[in-house]
Swiss-Prot record:
Organism this protein belongs to: Arabidopsis thaliana
Main location as per UniProt: nucleus
Keywords: Developmental protein, Nucleus
Location in the cell: Nucleus
InterPro entries per record: ARM-type_fold, Glomulin/ALF4, YAP-bd/ALF4/Glomulin
Name of this chain's protein: Aberrant root formation protein 4
SUPFAM superfamilies, per the entry: ARM repeat
Role noted for this protein: Required for the initiation of lateral roots independent from auxin signaling. May function in maintaining the pericycle in the mitotically competent state needed for lateral root formation.
Expressed in which tissues: Widely expressed. Expressed throughout the root tip, stele and lateral primordia. Also expressed in the shoots.
One Pfam assignment: Kinetochor_Ybp2
Domain of life: Eukaryota
Length: 626
């Protein structure tokens, strides 16, 4: 067992007298002469140091000695923790820890304990004792009682900063989940005890609590229910605080409460490992907090409610805004959970059918919803089931929506285009990596519908960004195929066709003449090259027919068939590509004749060669007419 040597600051008899005042038996002191050096067990040493702290405060000029004893006490506990950490399965050491914590609690609970001493110890003991909370259930209970004792005896505002500092330190402990439990429990009590400036105090504490909860959620063996209980306890305390306030401060505290609840929804959802339905009972308990602030599911899924909350609480404080990094994800998940279970909707007194109807009929709110769903669709930590429900919701709100509905020139989509683009980028990744064919099929349908819902002037900007940033030739091919399909739909309005046609040249050039320089890679980019050639071939034929019919709807036809653009395509795209394809085919046939990989490459290049020669023929024909 670890031994600790006593410092001979006081005589043994003096120390004994102080220990007796705390109810310590004579047998706790070994030795009988004033000059004897005493060697004690850890629990006895802790009692002695606490008694020395008490006696030094009573003596004139003893503050320096007091600080020294407190430092030694903390060092003693740290050393004890290090020894236990080295041999976590040593039951004997665990028993020693329980004895030490029990002695600390007894001394702190003594009626003779001086207030100055307990105030000074409060700056150190909550942090250092919380390390022992994960050793055993008994240790957890004792640490919680120690923290509660400080909360009861000390100034609430002091304890708020002390516990926040201890919580921040607990994030680095081996088991942040267990070690933070008594601190969070104590903090929930402190919130209620604060007498003034409640909002300012909570605004400092809540981000620290959220950081701890997020760290806990990332632990591999986290118990979601335990995590939720911790989070819910804090939420209940904040609600109790708001109920005691009036006017503006109450409104701010309620907004802060809503932000906290939305953020922990995201944290808890990410920690769920089995099925999405596991979050339903938890979200049902959170809904009353949100409805008490007047939040609605329409406001959550459009992001309007979270913007109002942030504006009220954070204002221009960018640093505080960063304390809620997952607020939009949480708001989206709250809505999706209501979609998963009618019980959640009932808890919020919401009718989701009316929300869907509103989104179907209101383009602006629908675009806002697209932007909010990107947080679910792009998350790498959520279960696929959440993403499946998000895709199904996209299909619900775009059902029956046509491109003509969103082409109202009075409605400006530019503010929402970045959010829609981010959502579609996540959708393209889902198409490639979804775990089953049904989800991939639904996601592809959602991609087509959302693209068609973007007003024509902005649709190309989104498509160009998707093609430019695509890292998959197959996905690039899919996107170019959608452009070709939109050109071929006779139901589209002229302005819609014009917007698509105007930018065909630029889209094709992105593939056939990559912006980073050099020729496209073969056979790696075969899918994208073939799709680009097919799109260009279709555009040439389409515009030729339109011109022959006298339907030059815009300058689009003359652009694609203009001598300048035809010569550019011929010299800069088609002829260099013809050389590249011919050399690639010849090289594969020559070097690896009969090899399966070689035959596969040739099989990829042959369709490209066929469409390429057809494009060259068409361009040469059009050039002759100029």
């Amino acid at each position: 067992m670890v031994k600790f040597a006593i410092i001979n600051t006081l005589t043994v008899n003096e120390t004994w007298a102080k220990l007796k005042s705390f109810g310590v038996m004579e047998s706790s002191i070994e030795g009988s002469s004033e000059s004897t050096t005493v060697t004690t067990s850890p629990s006895r040493r802790v009692r002695e140091l606490l008694a020395l702290c008490f006696s030094s405060v009573e003596e004139a000029g003893g503050f320096q000695d007091f600080e020294s004893f407190v430092t030694e006490l903390v060092s003693c506990l740290d050393s004890l923790y290090e020894n236990v950490a080295l041999d976590a399965n040593n039951e004997l050491e665990n028993d020693v820890i329980e004895e030490v914590l029990d002695e600390i609690l007894k001394v702190l609970s003594s009626p003779q304990m001086d207030q100055d001493v307990i105030d000074a110890l409060s700056f150190h003991l909550p942090k250092v004792t919380s390390k022992f909370a994960d050793i055993s259930s008994r240790c957890l209970q004792l640490v919680e009682e120690i923290v509660d004792r400080f909360v009861e005896a000390c100034n609430p505002r002091d304890m708020l900063s002390i516990l926040c500092e201890a919580l921040d330190a607990a994030r680095c402990y081996h088991s942040a989940s267990t070690c933070s439990t008594p601190l969070l429990h104590g903090l929930s009590k402190v919130f209620i005890l604060i007498q003034r400036r409640h909002y300012e105090q909570l605004k400092v504490a809540v981000p620290i609590v959220l950081n701890v909860l997020k760290d806990i959620s990332l632990e591999t063996d986290v118990q979601v229910e335990d995590l939720f209980d911790k989070a819910l306890g804090i939420a209940s305390s904040i609600r109790d605080v708001s109920s005691k306030l009036n006017n503006e401060e109450e409104a701010k505290v309620r907004c802060l409460l809503c932000l906290y609840v939305i953020q922990i929804t995201a944290i808890i959802s990410v920690s769920i490992r089995d099925k999405a339905a596991s979050c339903i009972p938890l979200v049902i308990q959170l809904e009353p907090f949100l409805t008490s602030c007047g939040l609605t599911h329409l406001g959550l899924i459009t992001g309007n409610d979270t913007e109002k909350l942030m504006s009220t609480v954070a204002g221009d404080d960018d640093e505080f805004i960063t304390s809620f990094p997952d607020i939009s994800l949480g708001a989206s998940l709250l809505f999706i959970c209501a979609k998963i279970s009618h019980e959640v909707a009932e808890a919020a007194n919401a009718v989701l059918g009316s929300v869907v109807d509103e989104l179907q009929n209101n383009p602006v709110k629908r675009w806002q919803a697209y932007g909010m769903l990107k947080y679910i669709l792009s998350s790498g930590d959520l279960l696929w089931e959440f993403k499946r429900h998000a895709i199904e919701f996209l299909l619900d709100i775009t059902k029956g929506v046509t491109s003509s509905q969103c082409n109202d020139e009075q409605i400006d989509c530019s503010d929402y285009t970045p959010g829609i683009y981010a959502t579609l980028q996540a959708v393209t990744l889902l198409i490639m990596y979804a775990p089953d064919a049904d989800l991939r099929k639904k996601t592809f349908e959602a991609l087509k519908r959302v693209l068609s819902d973007i007003p024509a002037p902005h649709r190309f900007d989104v498509l160009r960004a998707l093609v430019t940033n695509s890292r998959s030739p197959s996905m690039t091919a899919i996107l170019l195929g959608l452009v070709k399909d939109s050109m071929s739909k006779s139901s589209l309005q002229d302005t819609d066709c014009a917007a698509v046609d105007t930018h065909v040249i630029e889209l094709v050039e992105l593939v056939l003449r990559p912006p980073q320089g050099g020729p496209p890679l073969l056979p790696d980019q075969s899918d994208a090259i073939l799709a680009a050639l097919n799109l260009y071939r279709f555009a040439l034929l389409f515009e030729s027919r339109e011109c022959e019919a006298g339907k030059e709807r815009s300058k689009v036809g003359s652009d694609i068939l203009s001598k300048k653009n035809l010569e550019k395509a011929y010299k800069e795209w088609l002829l260099p590509l013809r050389t590249l394809v011919s050399c690639s085919i010849a090289e594969n046939l020559k070097e690896d004749h009969g090899q399966e990989s070689s035959l596969d490459d040739v099989g990829l290049l042959n369709p490209i060669e066929l469409v390429l020669y057809r494009c060259i023929e068409l361009v040469e024909e059009k050039l002759k007419s100029h």
